[in-house]
């Protein structure tokens, strides 16, 4: 948060010897090797870019989760990588989890992830970040996503 009170609180903590680098390291610089290899694999082999819709999709099959011994929390943050691609307004990640597919959506600009997730994927969240689910098989869920972005092309331009 960029609220002034947060900055005052952080300044107070720093003046008392708070070691922010140690906290950052514990939270973010603590991957296991398999997680980093998984991220590289899915970015190389599972990410699709739909430039005509300014959209990126990462569809992760169950076989990848098993191959890299990925647990539920290990996919956290995956949705943020494609947001760094110039021109991308919508990012979707779908993870094939047992009986259902879990969706994560992130947007930049004026595309409403919350409305999109509610309308197409039994989900919701916030304007720029939302989640959803699908009971369809992964390939069918991906086809429905592609149809959904086609229906929203004007909002994704």
Language model regions located:
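Hydrophobic helix-and-loop "lid/oligomerization" segment in the mid-to-C-terminal part
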Residues: 1-120, 125-157
């Amino acid at each position: 948060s960029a609220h002034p009170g947060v900055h005052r609180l952080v300044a107070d903590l720093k003046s008392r010897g708070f070691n922010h680098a140690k906290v950052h390291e514990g939270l973010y610089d603590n991957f296991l090797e398999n997680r980093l290899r998984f991220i590289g694999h899915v970015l190389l082999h599972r990410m699709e870019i739909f430039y005509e819709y300014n959209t990126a999709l990462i569809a992760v099959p169950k076989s990848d989760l098993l191959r890299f011994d990925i647990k539920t929390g290990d996919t956290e943050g995956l949705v943020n990588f494609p947001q760094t691609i110039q021109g991308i307004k919508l990012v979707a990640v779908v993870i094939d989890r047992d009986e259902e597919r879990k969706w994560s959506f992130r947007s930049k600009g004026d595309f409403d992830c919350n409305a999109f997730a509610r309308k197409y994927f039994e989900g919701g969240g916030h304007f720029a970040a939302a989640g959803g689910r699908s009971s369809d098989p992964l390939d069918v869920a991906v086809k429905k996503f592609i149809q959904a972005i086609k229906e929203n092309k004007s909002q994704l331009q």
